[in-house]
Amino acid sequence: MLKYLNQSEAINVDLELFNEYKFSVDQLMELAGLSCAHAIAKCFPADRFGRVLVCCGPGNNGGDGLVCARHLALMGYLPVLYYPKPTPKPLYENLAHQCKRMEIESISECPSVALAAECYDLIVDALFGFSFKPPVRADFVPVVELLQQTKLPIASVDIPSGWDVEAGKLNECDMEPTLLISLTAPKLCAKHFKGKHHFLGGRFVPPALQRKYELNLPTYPGNEMCLEL
């Protein structure tokens, strides 16, 4: 049976990938963001959902979002970045620079619900990952409220933003994405996910690490970067 990770297990799996298996952060981020773009393309084709608002947070989840935006652009989408608190580290600065050089538009103000409905077909939620602890910081309140109130479909990267990593929704107004892309392995909160599509991405887990944590990951078909759970 597929294992759902608690918060400490998710953190430890990541640490082992870095320390024991010598993956770099940017290496895993590239593979994770690429798999997110592939999952989005399977569920929301570019000819109908081409205008994508990609909301990025300050940590690794936001980095995954920056990578995802770049690959969506290469797949024929028109992503627009909302990145309210850029991380002042070379990795994130480079990812943001790559998006800029890919001619991906960036906005500095979070759009209203009405403006988002007019300008976009889909929202990518790459705000907070499995290290998130509430409450939401002031910088991110407007975009979390947009995610809670919009009628647009939402694709969440690893954890729906604002959810508890293990318990899921903390209150009734928390958003419910249409697509959840669990990375490496699903987290416990995914058991509470009621949206239409749940995908697994991040095809990089070494066999010994899978065995140690009894992840029981499904086999990815062929050369796929993601699979539907």
Swiss-Prot record:
Catalytic activity, as annotated: (6R)-NADHX = (6S)-NADHX; (6R)-NADPHX = (6S)-NADPHX
One Pfam family here: YjeF_N
Binding site for (6S)-NADPHX: 60-64, 129-135, 158
Keyword NAD: yes
Keyword terms, alphabetized: Isomerase, Metal-binding, NAD, NADP, Nucleotide-binding, Potassium
Cofactor info, note text: Binds 1 potassium ion per subunit.
GO molecular function: metal ion binding; NAD(P)HX epimerase activity; nucleotide binding
Domain named YjeF N-terminal: residues: 10-217
Necessary cofactors: K(+)
GO cellular component, one term: mitochondrion
Gene3D superfamilies: YjeF N-terminal domain
Enzyme Commission no: 5.1.99.6
Keyword Isomerase set for record: yes
Coiled-coil annotated spans: none
Function: Catalyzes the epimerization of the S- and R-forms of NAD(P)HX, a damaged form of NAD(P)H that is a result of enzymatic or heat-dependent hydration. This is a prerequisite for the S-specific NAD(P)H-hydrate dehydratase to allow the repair of both epimers of NAD(P)HX.
Protein name per its UniProtKB record: NAD(P)H-hydrate epimerase
